[in-house]
Design a protein with these regions (language model features):
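Membrane-embedded, hydrophobic transmembrane alpha-helices
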Residues: 1-88
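Membrane-interfacial, low-structure loops and terminal tails that flank and connect transmembrane helices
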Residues: 4, 85-92, 194-206, 256-257
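Aromatic- and kink-enriched transmembrane "portal" helix at the membrane-lumen/periplasm boundary
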Residues: 6-9, 13, 57-58, 205-240
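Transmembrane alpha-helices of multi-pass, membrane-embedded glycan-processing enzymes
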Residues: 16-23, 44-48, 71-72, 154, ...
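Specific aromatic-rich, kink-prone transmembrane helix
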Residues: 23-24, 28, 237-256
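Membrane-interfacial loop-to-transmembrane alpha-helix junctions, especially the N-terminal start
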Residues: 31-46, 91-95, 201-213
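Transmembrane signal-anchor helices characteristic of membrane glycosylation enzymes that use polyprenol
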Residues: 79, 93-117, 220-221
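Active-site lumenal/periplasmic loops and adjacent helix-entry segments of GT-C-fold
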Residues: 106-211, 226-232
Length: 257
């Protein structure tokens, strides 16, 4: 039990990461139409926020804290609009997948950083972002960071979750990694339903069908090493984003054929 239940900080981590995930989803959904693949909404929202933070921080030196507040307000408005338009923000299948992996979520929220690259880059960069409120520069060096010029897209996730929590969250990346895999599981279900010509399966999202999507992404190995899924490494998010791009490209080719 000590590996699953430790203290109240586990609840704080889960709630904060979930808030960021819903914000990503709301923003992504607001950018798409009724015919979109809803499972890709978080990726779209994350991408737009990454572009906004990078542009504002690099070109105009706008503090991250101010951008976070603006992003929160925008996401709240987008969430209300999407809810009224679609009747919800997060697909019901995703919520069922979360319920199926509650023990895994408890384990992840009890975890702390443990891998070498986390201490040299993946958690130290977001900590600098949280403490300095700006990108690294001549006047704001990140002295202990190994790769300060590395793209910041993935670091925004840990930063935003920590900003919501009010404390630095070492396990935010691991939680988002699992959320991303579950999201991709819904895409796998959509492809299966399309292949067997039963699109109604996606709409019904019964427990058996949903569990198949979860098994497809959690039991398989999405990266070169399964253990890094439960870390702040960027390999899992990169794999999911790449897979999403491949699927979208394939669907575009099918539509044009």
């Amino acid at each position: 039990a000590q590996y699953f239940i430790q203290d109240s900080s586990q609840v704080l981590a889960f709630v904060s990461v979930t808030f960021v995930w819903i914000a990503f989803t709301a923003l992504g959904a607001a950018c798409g139409g009724a015919g979109r693949i809803r499972a890709f909404d978080p990726l779209v929202g994350w991408a737009w926020l990454g572009v906004a933070f990078t542009t504002a921080g690099v070109l105009f030196s706008i503090p991250f804290s101010l951008m976070s507040v603006l992003a929160g307000v925008l996401a709240s408005g987008a969430g209300v609009w999407v809810w009224r338009r679609d009747g919800g923000i997060v697909p019901s299948g995703f919520l069922r997948l979360l319920m199926l992996i509650i023990p895994l979520l408890a384990l992840i929220t009890a975890m702390r950083a443990s891998q070498w690259d986390e201490f040299s880059h993946w958690i130290i960069i977001p900590r600098y972002m949280l403490e300095t409120d700006a990108f690294p520069s001549g006047g704001n060096p990140y002295p202990n960071a190994g790769l300060a010029a590395y793209p910041f897209g993935w670091n925004f996730v840990t930063y935003l979750a920590s900003r919501v929590a009010g404390v630095f969250l070492e396990n935010a990346g691991a939680l988002i990694n699992v959320f991303l895999l579950l999201m991709f599981g819904l895409v796998v279900l959509r492809l299966i339903a399309q292949a067997i010509e039963k699109p109604e399966l996606v709409q019904k999202s019964n427990w058996y069908f949903v569990s198949l999507g979860g098994a497809a992404v959690l039991l398989a190995n999405p990266t070169f090493s399964q253990k890094i899924v439960l870390t702040s490494y960027a390999e899992t998010s990169t794999a999911v984003a790449t897979g999403a791009g491949v699927i979208l490209g394939w669907l575009i080719c099918c539509a044009l054929a």
